[in-house]
Amino acid sequence: MIFYKQRNAHLKPNETINYKDIDLLRKFITDQSKIVSRRSNGLTVKQQKQLAKSIKKARILALLPFVNKD
């Protein structure tokens, strides 16, 4: 059985996620620019879907990188 470290959600239950809020979106991206799973970030299903859409939209608009160049 795999145990995941529970992270505290950075969002309140009714808070919406906006693609323009880059600082918030960066909290849910790994150093390899992958979106953190819902299991490990503590978001609800609805919030995770909003988060994924916002991150993808921010990447297309060049607000976030697709891949980090480290």
UniProtKB/Swiss-Prot annotation:
BP GO annotations: translation
Q: What are its GO cellular component terms?
A: chloroplast; ribonucleoprotein complex; ribosome
GO MF annotations in UniProt: small ribosomal subunit rRNA binding; structural constituent of ribosome
Location(s) in or outside the cell:
Plastid, Chloroplast
Keywords, A to Z, come to: Chloroplast, Plastid, Ribonucleoprotein, Ribosomal protein, RNA-binding, rRNA-binding
Gene3D superfamilies in alphabetical order:
Ribosomal protein S18 (4.10.640.10)
- Domain of life per record: Eukaryota
| S-S pairs | none
What is the similarity comment for this entry?
A: Belongs to the bacterial ribosomal protein bS18 family.
| Subunit and partners | Part of the 30S ribosomal subunit.
In its UniProt entry, what is this protein called? Small ribosomal subunit protein bS18c
What species is given as this protein's source? Gracilaria tenuistipitata var. liui (Red alga)
